[in-house]
């Protein structure tokens, strides 16, 4: 784990995502003194996510970005697992939103599938795998999750993706209804990232 100590002195980090919501969340979790870059700053195309797990896909994205930019690159692969749908959409969460990334389409699809099963309040969880890739090819993956249940109709406008239908365990509001500060404190993304902070004390 000693190689990741270089993160402590990192001045530039590429957040390898084209999802504005994910970029903002990761940026808010990371130290403020670092200059952050997006894939479009380097005209990077999205690599093909051929992995079978969240960790595998996160690694594909971070490795691709680090290799082509020479910067420490952080990527995440996350998704919603719905128990009543055998943990689908899972790693296909973004694809369910279609090429335009319209999550209203994905949410409607989940609603229709659950309605047929009479399981609209199915238990579910958000899973996030974060991968850190160094310019020497080393990668490190961490995973976090938050349990909860689904709620229809969608509620709230503060989140993105499936946030409007996900109620974290112990809460009565959806991710899209609670504040960014509160969401960042309990989110699957934060739980994955906090594992990096255990090893690397950002100053």
Model-found features: residue ranges?
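Anionic-ligand binding patches
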Residues: 2-16, 20-203
């Amino acid at each position: 784990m000693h190689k990741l100590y270089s993160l402590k002195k990192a001045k530039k980090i590429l957040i390898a995502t084209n999802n504005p919501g994910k970029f903002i969340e990761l940026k808010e979790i990371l130290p403020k003194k670092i200059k952050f870059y997006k894939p479009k700053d380097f005209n990077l195309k999205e690599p093909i996510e051929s992995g079978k797990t969240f960790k595998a896909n996160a690694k594909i994205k971070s490795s691709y970005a680090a290799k082509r930019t020479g910067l420490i690159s952080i990527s995440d692969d996350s998704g919603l697992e719905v128990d009543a749908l055998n943990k689908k959409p899972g790693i296909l969460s973004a694809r369910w939103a279609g090429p335009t990334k319209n999550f209203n389409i994905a949410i409607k699809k989940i609603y229709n599938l659950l309605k047929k099963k009479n399981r609209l309040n199915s238990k579910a969880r958000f899973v996030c795998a974060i991968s850190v890739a160094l310019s020497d090819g080393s990668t490190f993956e961490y995973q976090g999750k938050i349990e909860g249940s689904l709620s229809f109709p969608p509620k709230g406008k503060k989140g993105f993706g499936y946030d409007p239908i996900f109620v974290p365990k112990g809460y009565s509001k959806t991710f899209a209804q609670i504040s960014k500060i509160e969401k960042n404190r309990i989110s699957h993304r934060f739980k994955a990232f906090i594992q990096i902070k255990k090893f690397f004390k950002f100053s």
